[in-house]
Structures are given as structure tokens and as C-alpha cells.
């Protein structure tokens, strides 16, 4: 079945998909640097609108369905949504990190739901990053970065290049021969020191094992961490173990949404506690 027919078929039963209550969609074929499917997306309430470019024969359409139809990053139905929304409103410049941004669909979803946030998306694969940049063009608050993410500033190479478009993995090393800069979360926070940490979304295909191996003080600064773990993809590799150790002593709720785990701080909304958390995080003390 042609990709445009597949997408159109999705919209024939809008009640099946929560995203159809949030957005209107208009799929069409388009040509720009090669043939792809374009989907015009408009919010049913508010002024958000964008055109998504998806590659036929890839996992782009499945990613689109997860984010915009099944709304796996939606918090509005969670018991703590009002608390999350209040915290967001209290931030002058909320910061969202989209680590493993793929082609930018998650960044755009965050831009719709949290319109005053600065969204920094990091994606290692060149093809994904090119489409990411095209998809977010015109959205001034979305900052695309090509690179990997790691526990410290280093370099990386992409491995398993034959994987699907959402399955690229990175291997961290200290040699520039890798050709790809790997940034730490602290570097991103330093670059945007005028912003207040809000959401950190992580989908980095098993690289969470290295990311959480050290220098995890930043975790306490984010009221919301959204992560997809990959033990199912790499059995007996312990890819989630370091994440679990990093958050084990923290007071947080954990909520499953699709393939993602939402980790929501119990201290959110308490200014004195947030200030204390920041101080303890800087000192390397778990909260």
C-alpha cells in the first residue's frame, strides 16, 4: 500500500486515535529533494501548524503515528498534568531537550504543547538530521543540532548503519577520528543557561547505558524525564541499568506511555525544594 494511502486510512477512523482530537491532518504527495509524503498538521485549538515530510519505505510513518496519532508524549491525561502545566507557566523560559530527535517530530509535538519553550534537538544521523532541519524550518524556538549525546564531551561514530531510520546507534570514544561530536547534557544546559530545565526526552537506542554511567547530576534539575529503554533490543547488555541506578534514590513518579517512561519529580512546583535540588545536583548529591 502506498504511504499516502496508509496515512489516509489512519484518518478514516479518527476516534481510534487520540491525536485526531488534537490535530487535523491532510496527507499528500510532494517533491522536494526527492519524493516523500507530506502531511499538513494543524492544531484544532490554537495557531500551531506545520508540514511534516516523511520518507516512504522507512520508519518515519510509524514514528509519525506514535507521536501525532497515539500521542505518546502527551501529559494532558495524566493525574499530574495540572501540576506540570502550572510549573511550565511559572517558567519564564522553559527548556526542553530532545535527545535522539530523529526527523524532528517529537520536537514539533513539544513545540505545539509547550509553545514558549526553547527546544534543543540532538540527532546523530546525517539523513535524519537533514530532514529534521527541514521539518522544523520556521519554528524559531526549535534548535536542531547534529551530534551524539554522552556523559561527557567526547566524540562518536555511528554503528549499525544498516538499521532502520530510528535505529541508528552511536559508540563513544575520545578520538576525533569518530568524526561526530558527542555533547553532554551539562554542555547543553550551559549553552542555554538563561532557560529553566523542564523536559528531557531521551530515545538514543541503547546509548543510555553510557549517558547515565557518570555525571548524572543534571537529572535532578529536570522535573520531567521521558526515556525509552532498550533492554528489549539489546538483551543481556544492561542498557537500562545505569539509568535505574541514577534515579533509584530520587523521589519521582514513573508512568508508562507507549514505549516511554515518564519520570516526574515529586518536588516539582515547590520553589524552595527546586532551589535545594539544583544546589544538591551541582554538588553531585542525589535527590
Label every PLM stretch briefly.
Residues 1-287:
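Phosphate/nucleotide-binding beta-alpha loop and adjacent structural elements of enzyme active sites
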